[in-house]
Amino acid sequence: MKLDISLFNSIAQQAKESPRLRMHYDLRDSSEENGQRMLNVLLPGTLENVHRHTNTSEVVICIQGKAIETFYDDNGNITETVEMVAGGECPGVVVEINRWHSIAPVDGPATVITTMAGKYDPESIETL
C-alpha cells in the first residue's frame, strides 16, 4: 500500500464531509492487532477535545502540512505548544502517558500518522 497524495486527498474529502472536519484511516491489518496506527487528516476548524491516554504514550508525526500539538496541565492551562511541520525541523512529538493534549492544523489541512501501543480502548481516554 502506498501512502501517497491520492490517498491523502481521498481522506481529506471524507473529512470535508464530516461535521468533525477530520477523518482517520486505519493502517492496521485488523482491529485485533495489539497496537494502533492511523493516518489522520485534520482540516481548519476541527475541534479536538483536550484528552489524555491513561495506558500508553502516543507518537504523532506530521507528514503533510503543519499542525500544533498543545499540552495542558490538570486545570486546562496551556503548558506547551509544539509546531510540527512535515519535512521540517520538528515533524513530530511523543505524547507521554497521562499528558493532556490536543492537536489542530495550521494554515490549511494537515496529515499526521499516529501510533499507540495496545488495542483501542475508549475507557483509557479521559477528556478534560
Residue ranges and their predicted role:
Residues 1-35, 81-86:
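A short, N-terminal "cap"/entry segment at the start of jelly-roll beta-barrel domains
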Residues 35-37, 56-58, 90, 109-110:
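Short, surface-exposed beta-edge/turn micro-motifs
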Residues 39-55:
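Conserved short histidine dyad/triad with adjacent acidic residue
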Residues 49-51, 69-71, 92-95, 101-106, ...:
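Short beta-strand His + acidic residue motifs that chelate non-heme Fe in jelly-roll/DSBH
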Residues 55-75:
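Glycine- and acidic-residue-biased ligand/ion/polar-headgroup-sensing regions
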Residues 59, 108-125:
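A short hydrophobic beta-strand segment most commonly corresponding to one strand
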Residues 73-98:
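Short acidic-glycine-tyrosine-enriched beta hairpin
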